[in-house]
Amino acid sequence: MCEGYATGLSIQAALRSMYSDAAVIVCFSAYNLAHVGRQVKKGFVFADHDEAGIRAAEELPWPWVKSDAPGEDANDLHLRAGLRAVRSVLQSAILGKRGGE
């Protein structure tokens, strides 16, 4: 799950490059991220690296990750550092880490 449409496209591209057919749910806001997340049984969150995004991700019991740069989302990371960087962050979520542990 993520907030923005472009963010979701970057996550989907990274997942496909990892040979995953996982669905990406785009929630369009941090508020919706927490709300929609409570309706879904399991998953992980690629949070925007800002106060609202992190707070929403922490409300859910799932693994969650964020870009290493404050203010960035997955699409910003994709544009700055490439798809490999997005894959690397996603692998942490797949391994069950919360918040880039």
Would you name each region that the model predicts?
Residues Y5-E101:
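TOPRIM fold recognition
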